[in-house]
């Protein structure tokens, strides 16, 4: 049991205090086998029509600025077959726009929220100064992107 549980890829995810930026946050989730694990959950994965889910997501204290350190080798130095640690059931439906028209699209498991679902996840708080997002073109005007 211990080898099966601990002999997995590891991701250490830097988390910054949530100051309203869009992005995924650290949450405990329960998979289809009823097992709890730490995951990075994106807003598109949350049923915002469900008042309690929306409240939990909206009140999250931290989010992931995509600062990750990963270990992809086993304790004996062999590379993991990373496809063995994907949760292929973690796809979700999201709204996108194509040529100014709203459409719904199925997203397959993303890197944080499916492809790394069965990794060992460790979340650590990092200073906000390490986060300089580019989610929109206006973010390029922020202090962290100005060199003059």
Model-derived segments and their meaning:
Residues 1-148:
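OB-fold and OB-like single-stranded nucleic-acid-recognition modules
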């Amino acid at each position: 049991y211990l080898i099966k549980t601990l002999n997995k890829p590891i991701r250490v995810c830097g988390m910054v205090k949530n100051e309203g930026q869009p992005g995924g946050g650290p949450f405990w989730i329960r998979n289809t086998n009823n097992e709890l694990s730490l995951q990075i959950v994106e807003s598109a994965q949350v049923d915002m029509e469900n008042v309690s889910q929306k409240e939990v997501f909206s009140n999250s204290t931290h989010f992931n600025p995509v600062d990750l350190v990963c270990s992809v080798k086993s304790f004996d130095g062999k590379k993991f077959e990373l496809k063995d640690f994907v949760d292929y059931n973690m796809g979700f439906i999201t709204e996108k726009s194509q040529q100014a028209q709203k459409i719904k699209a199925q997203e397959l498991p993303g890197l944080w929220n499916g492809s790394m679902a069965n990794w060992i996840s460790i979340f650590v708080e990092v200073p906000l100064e390490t986060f300089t997002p580019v989610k929109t073109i206006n973010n390029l005007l922020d202090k962290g992107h100005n060199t003059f």
